[in-house]
């Protein structure tokens, strides 16, 4: 908990830089008429522009995030409680420091995060930058309001309530109880750093100065 609160504070005060781009490892593609990774493909170009979205191959997810910064990262693959095939395992969160603030994952089993050694929860406990972790695809998530300054908590509620407002080709498991956010619901993608170096003087008048955000 101490580590999470510290990196949350650092993100809000821009003590580390999160490059505005997205990373994708898509091991499913078209899966029985649905495409789980559409949650990344339709949001990341909107957030950052198509030139700031990178797709990596098998084994490239953690090795890339350990060395480069991405504001958002997505990975999907056949799952277990502690892994997503072609993406990584909980051990990768321990041995590496993934530099993605918002993490979106999809695969079997680990969406049930109330177990030990859980792949979805491991991200926010890592020494990397991850502050929010989402299990998406069943149903699809809608986080586009974050591009206009809304919080991830706002988008969590939007997704939880969504049935017909936003539609995908399939939207299996819409409005079910498992839709949840791992992390701080007040996080925003567009952080405004607090003003710094406040000073005041009082003579004939009171004069306040500060360094702007």
Regions found by a protein language model. Give the residues of each.
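Pro/Thr/Ser/Gly-rich low-complexity, intrinsically disordered linker/stalk tracts
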Residues: 188-213
């Amino acid at each position: 908990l101490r580590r999470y609160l510290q990196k949350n504070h650092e993100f809000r005060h821009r003590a580390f830089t999160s490059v505005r781009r997205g990373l994708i490892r898509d091991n499913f593609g078209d899966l029985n008429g649905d495409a789980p990774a559409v949650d990344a493909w339709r949001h990341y170009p909107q957030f950052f522009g198509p030139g700031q979205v990178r797709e990596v191959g098998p084994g490239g997810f953690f090795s890339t995030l350990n060395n480069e910064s991405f504001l958002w990262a997505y990975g999907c693959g056949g799952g277990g409680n502690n892994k997503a095939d072609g993406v990584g395992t909980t051990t990768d969160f321990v041995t590496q420091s993934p530099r993605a603030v918002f993490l979106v994952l999809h695969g079997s089993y680990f969406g049930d995060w109330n177990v030990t050694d859980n792949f979805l929860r491991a991200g926010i406990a890592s020494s990397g930058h991850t502050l929010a972790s989402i299990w998406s695809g069943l149903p699809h998530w809608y986080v586009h309001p974050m591009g206009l300054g809304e919080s991830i908590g706002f988008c969590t509620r939007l997704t939880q309530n969504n049935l017909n407002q936003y539609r995908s080709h399939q939207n299996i498991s819409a409005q079910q109880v498992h839709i949840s956010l791992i992390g701080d619901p007040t996080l925003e993608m567009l952080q405004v750093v607090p003003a710094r170096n406040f000073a005041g003087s009082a003579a004939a008048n009171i004069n306040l100065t500060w360094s702007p955000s």
